[in-house]
Amino acid sequence: MAATIDDEVHALAQRLWDFHTAPAAHSPPTPGEHDIILALGSHDLRVAEHAAHLWDAGAAPLIVLSGQRGRRTAGAHGHDRWPRPEAEEFAQTARATAGIPSTAMLLETHATNTAENFTHSRALTAAHGIAVTRAIVTAKPYMGQRALATATAHWPEARWTFHCFAGGYTDYPNADTPTEELVHFLVGDTQRLDVYARRRWSSPVDIPDDVWRAYELLVARGFTNHLVDNDTTSHPRPTGRSVP
């Protein structure tokens, strides 16, 4: 079934957006309160711009930019393959945004998924002798729930805060990510919270019944491009999952 956008889809997608962005901090971080800013690589360079603004405001002395290429930046679904790893593209954007010196950035160029963003960055900071007890993670706004769930599973000794660039569901789409693709991403990230927790790739997150119902209705409407294999029969449903 071809996915089409209408008022029902907008309402359902708005519910997913509100859920996924709920963990985002709305007040500016206190200068000097965090050890690092971890920017999760993706196709959205606004994340790198926001990380640069956080650094420029004194949120942390160091930015860790993490990412090789994901499905989108590797050329999936007809998109152009990025010539360089996401971390390198992010670094270029961060420099252009706030003039960040190379000494204030660490580039992690091997991660191909969110779990690896954290495990590889954790190893990289440790190799540089950097103790991380409080940290900011920034990513696409709708990755708030998944970013923190992954952080607590793979870098649990640090206390994490999620920050993202401003704007809501209707503000996020642009020429690079139209509304239809955003809805596919929202559906996929909702599924990942459930599936990845069962696979023990991330910590369990309580998904309210109305959020899960919105997800199911959007899947039925054809928004399935960002779904992953759901063969998790050998894994128990996480206790944090609210079953409809």
Where are these regions (language model features)?
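A conserved mid-domain beta-alpha-beta active-site/ligand-binding segment of alpha/beta enzyme cores
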Residues: 175-232
